């Protein structure tokens, strides 16, 4: 029954794609590749695969909605397993109730999470649970943790990676102890942070790197931050990256969106929406870059850029939740706890704020002058006005009674 259901769902989801030769989108073939993991087969699975992808889930309840949600997750995993079948990656499920002892041994704590075991490392996937995102994430994981840059064209390719944190080191050769320390450090952050290395003196000269020196490139910055006190141990590199891995301006990416969202500052995010492919969005992004470059030394500033094109399924949700129009650039403050938000007034796409105006607005945010409680205070004020209005009504009634009494007295005098 399971196989028939998954086959039908797979066909329904993917059969709308064209079937021309060379563009055959994968459809689920009905073969079960995702298995249940237990204490008995763990050792065998680890020995068999280079990577082991584990979905840690709560027990499947009897209600239909929960069952369908679980089955949709299952078909995503089955499709990914099918696409990557030739890559020696195993896919398993771990029931939190049936395999509680195993989950504790593996260090799993959050139900609904996806983990990847690679050697002695456990990597948690904190991105969108979608087949294409998962495939890209796993392909990045099976690559070498360090990519070598050998010539000018590869330098150009490296320099065009502007929206990700990256490191590049210059070493004597692959046998260098300092290069090996660099490799070990890279494994701690793969695939979320890119590590590059060169053994070419001309490349190093172009990038202004000395022997055994490593440049740390923050997203959207023109110049790298050269890590001090070379040469470095693995521990020193890891410590430096962890200390500096929250950039001034970063992009929300499907592969690590939840981890990024949880990395807030004092419970808030400064969020900017801008479509890079749209002229106004591109212009606004360039203004954001300038602000980030001018304020890169401010540890309290971190702007989260979201390109709506990266998250088409979330656009309607964001517009409803934040009460904004995502067809034009937006920047605001979002409380990560309750999604309360307040947004900068941008009256017209043709009248985007300047870098100076944006900096002034951000300064007000960081000082607390602009905050997500403003709307709540306004609501309270409105309530206060209502109470005042009620009091006024009472006063009016009292005055009316007094007028009536005066009128009665006048009538008595007439009599």
UniProtKB/Swiss-Prot annotation:
InterPro entries: Calsequestrin, Calsequestrin_C, Calsequestrin_CS, Calsequestrin_middle_dom, Calsequestrin_N, Thioredoxin-like_sf
GO cellular component: junctional membrane complex; sarcoplasmic reticulum; sarcoplasmic reticulum lumen; Z disc
Source organism of this protein record: Mus musculus (Mouse)
Annotated signal peptide: 1-19
Glycosylation: residue positions: 335
One example GO MF annotation: calcium ion binding
Record note on modification: Phosphorylation in the C-terminus moderately increases calcium buffering capacity. N-glycosylated.
Tissue: Detected in heart (at protein level). Detected in heart.
Function: Calsequestrin is a high-capacity, moderate affinity, calcium-binding protein and thus acts as an internal calcium store in muscle. Calcium ions are bound by clusters of acidic residues at the protein surface, especially at the interface between subunits. Can bind around 60 Ca(2+) ions. Regulates the release of lumenal Ca(2+) via the calcium release channel RYR2; this plays an important role in triggering muscle contraction. Plays a role in excitation-contraction coupling in the heart and in regulating the rate of heart beats.
GO biological process: negative regulation of potassium ion transport; regulation of cardiac muscle contraction by regulation of the release of sequestered calcium ion; regulation of heart rate; regulation of membrane repolarization; regulation of membrane repolarization during ventricular cardiac muscle cell action potential; regulation of muscle contraction; regulation of release of sequestered calcium ion into cytosol by sarcoplasmic reticulum; sarcomere organization
Modified sites of kind Phosphotyrosine: 282
Protein name, entry field: Calsequestrin-2
Record note on quaternary structure: Monomer, homodimer and homooligomer. Mostly monomeric in the absence of calcium. Forms higher oligomers in a calcium-dependent manner. Dimers associate to form tetramers, that then form linear homomer chains. Interacts with ASPH and TRDN.
Keywords carried by this UniProt record: Calcium, Glycoprotein, Metal-binding, Muscle protein, Phosphoprotein, Sarcoplasmic reticulum, Signal
Mutant lacking the gene: phenotype: Mutant mice are born at the expected Mendelian rate, are viable and display normal sarcoplasmic calcium release and normal heart function under basal conditions, but have a slower heart rate. Mutant mice are subject to polymorphic arrhythmia after exercise and to catecholaminergic ventricular arrhythmia, and their myocytes show increased Ca(2+) release in response to isoproterenol. Besides, the volume of the junctional sarcoplasmic reticulum is increased, and it seems to lack visible content.
